[in-house]
Every structure is written in C-alpha cells, then in structure tokens.
C-alpha cells in the first residue's frame, strides 16, 4: 500500500510504501541460536522509501530484523515480493511507467517492462504477475514474464484498486467493475476469462481482499460503514459486518487471517476492527417465559415490516475485536499473523512504525499493544504509546494511485509512451542469460532469504 500523502510527501519516516508478504512462510535453516530451530515461521514486511527499499522479517514480538536493504533505486513507490523468495517487483516515482523485476539476493535485474501510463499497483502469486494502470490491467506469466492477456478499457480506477488470490487452484483477480457503484469484476487469470460480476455495494469500491484459499472475497465501499464477504467465484454473500454507524470513513486495507476465520479492516480513523467469520447455528424456537422474552420475540417479528435497510442492520455482524491506534489520519496497512503461536494484528503506518497487538481468538474485545518498531532504519523499539500530539496531521485519504490519476505529484516523461504492439507493454532487455526460460516461481532458483545471525 502506498503511504504517501496527498501532496506526494512521504510520511514521518520517509516511507512511501509498505506491504506484508502474501503468507507466513517457513524459512529453512534458521539459526537455533536465534531461538528459531531449523525451521521457523517468519512474517515478512516490504518497505519502500525515498532512499530505496528494505525487507524486514518478524519471527518474534521483540525483534524486527532487517534482512535486506537496497539504496540503488530512489523514491520506491511500489515494492512487491513473491512470498519469501528473492523475486521482487519494483516501481519508482522517477520512472512510474516502468516495472523492474529483480533477484534481490543476487543483486541483479531480471527484466523490465514499460507501459503506456503510470503503474498504480502490482500483484504477485506463483502463477501470475498483474500490473494495474488506471484503465487497463496486464496479466503476465510469472515463469517467463510474457504478457498473456490485457484487460482494456476498464472503468476509471485512479487508486489502482485490485486484488489477486494467492491460491494456485483459485487464481482470481478482482477489480472495480464500475466507477460509480460498488461492482466487483472477478477474472480467472488461469483460463483468461471473466468469472463473475458481483454487485457488492451501492457506493464505489474502496478496498478488496481475497482469503488464502481464494474462495472468499472481502469488499468495502467508499462509504466505509459495511464490510461484505462473498463466495468466489459464485458471488454469493456469506457475511455482512457493520464497521460503524455514526460516520463514514476511508477504508485503508482489508486482510484475512491465514485460516480464514478472521477479517481485519483498518481506516483513516484510530480504530481497527476485527470480525470473526463464523456461522451462528440456529436454535429451535422456544416459547418465552418472561415479559422480556415476549418483548424480544415481538421485536424480532416486527423487523419483517421494517424497510429493508433497517432489517439489514439487525442482521449485520459487529466487530469481534478492536484495536485503538495511537494516531488518526495516517495511511496504514494491516495483517493478521500468528507469531510465536499467538494470533497478532500487525499495522504498518505512514508515521514510520510497525504496531503489534495481541488478539484473543476466543474472547475478542480490545487488543493490547505489545510492541512497536521503527521502520525508517533506526534501531528504536519501544513499548510506549507515542505522544498523540506527534501524530496530529491532516487526514491522509488519497493513495498514490489517486494522486497519480490527478497528476498532482508523480513525475511524467516528456513524451507519452505509445503502444508498440497489440498487448501494450514494452519489454526491456532481459539481463540474465537464462531469462529465456525463467522459473520465477521455483524456490530452488529464487530461494528464500536465510536469516543471518552473525
């Protein structure tokens, strides 16, 4: 997620972008001295900044380890890592129409592509690489980076909103099907055909997220009060949660837990909501024996005579757990992870911090802040809540994509790049001898990083 402000300035820690890896991946050969044994589950965070990009690993609450830093490319506005491999896709503000695919462990550039307009988002899984422009989407084969398909003339999408499932069998892409209402277009990236159009919301979409299995899709609109979950590819509404009633907010991110049991939603407010995806078993009706019981039965029966909007509110789920962030107005991205066998909520924010909260999977309630780590390169780590005064700033609700669409701060080349072929993406020179038969999804060729303990 891009963390730049509306004016294009980086956050307090000079951050431009932050994103968690697609899943919690086992790192082979981790040191016993580090308390990780031979195999350990490590959560990874990619950060782009004015000075380059970095990768952090998080195997415990107390330690955020920087495993890689690159300062060769400045103003990195997009940095997407393929799970915990060494493959990374990079876009810079200085060349916003150019995508570079690199092997960061070797320090080599594998290939690059130039597009006709600003790149607003890049998504990766082990089958496909997706490049999102304002009015088109490019589907690349991750094995050789060839363009397989182009979705043209999509509704204007200045925020670059899209989501890609990480599941190989359910490899779906979701993106807005309308610029005026909350329709979701679901596209099968393996068979290269449209799968479904889901009428998710009345207002335009603001956030999308697949679960790990690729069978559920969470959606939120610009209004930000209701979160919905649909089955994929059928498009049946499975869950509906109400984030709030009093005010409309800008949803920053949605994230499922790896088991698909929880869904988190962060916004431009100080509250992160966590919903539990469980179907309540219907109990057989019982005759009420008290006055309050009779009153409740009459109340539920009366809902059938109320307007549909009011009836829906009675049936919407509420947050299972909440998190109170020490700031309001910063762009942020959340993730639900299991670290040291305990469910945690992780929040990376434009103020330059990573916040870690404990989640009680049985009781829920308000989550406790366990740790916060600096992401700007310093070694500062603290348990204390930052002074709220240091977080006071105008609300930041516009993404890099939205700003780019309005031409507010993204540099553009003097001449517009024209399409040179029917696919619309210009491939640069491959810089590896074996690029003609790249196997970018193979860990043997692009192995995970090994945690260093020296």
UniProtKB/Swiss-Prot annotation:
Regions crossing the membrane: none
Sites of Phosphoserine modification: 413
UniProt subcellular location: Preautophagosomal structure membrane
Coiled-coil boundaries: none
Main subcellular location: membrane
InterPro entries according to UniProt: PROPPIN, WD40/YVTN_repeat-like_dom_sf, WD40_repeat_dom_sf, WD40_rpt
Motif (L/FRRG motif): 241-244
Topology of the protein relative to the lipid bilayer: Peripheral membrane protein
A Pfam family matched in the record: PROPPIN
Stated consequence of mutating residue 242 to T: Impairs preautophagosomal localization
Keywords tagged on the record: Autophagy, Disease variant, Intellectual disability, Lipid-binding, Membrane, Phosphoprotein, Repeat, WD repeat
Highest taxon above the source species: Eukaryota
Keyword Lipid biosynthesis: no
Effect in UniProt of substituting residue 126 to E: Impairs interaction with ATG16L1
Gene3D superfamilies: YVTN repeat-like/Quinoprotein amine dehydrogenase
Single biological process term from Gene Ontology: pexophagy
MF terms (GO), sorted A to Z: phosphatidylinositol-3,5-bisphosphate binding; phosphatidylinositol-3-phosphate binding; phosphatidylinositol-5-phosphate binding; protein-macromolecule adaptor activity
SS bond list: none
Record text about domains: The L/FRRG motif is required for recruitment to PtdIns3P.
Role description: Component of the autophagy machinery that controls the major intracellular degradation process by which cytoplasmic materials are packaged into autophagosomes and delivered to lysosomes for degradation. Involved in an early step of the formation of preautophagosomal structures. Binds and is activated by phosphatidylinositol 3-phosphate (PtdIns3P) forming on membranes of the endoplasmic reticulum upon activation of the upstream ULK1 and PI3 kinases. Mediates ER-isolation membranes contacts by interacting with the ULK1:RB1CC1 complex and PtdIns3P.
Similarity-based family: Belongs to the WD repeat PROPPIN family.
Oligomer status and interactors: Interacts with TECPR1. Interacts with ATG16L1. Interacts with ATG5. Interacts with WIPI1. Interacts with WDR45. May interact with NUDC. Interacts with ULK1 and RB1CC1.
Implicated disorder: Intellectual developmental disorder with short stature and variable skeletal anomalies: An autosomal recessive disorder characterized by severe intellectual disability, speech and language impairment, developmental delay, and cardiac, thyroid and skeletal abnormalities. Skeletal features include short stature, camptodactyly, fifth finger clinodactyly, thumb hypoplasia, overlapping toes, and kyphosis or lumbar vertebral abnormalities.
Protein name: WD repeat domain phosphoinositide-interacting protein 2
Organism whose genome encodes this protein: Homo sapiens
Gene name of the record: WIPI2
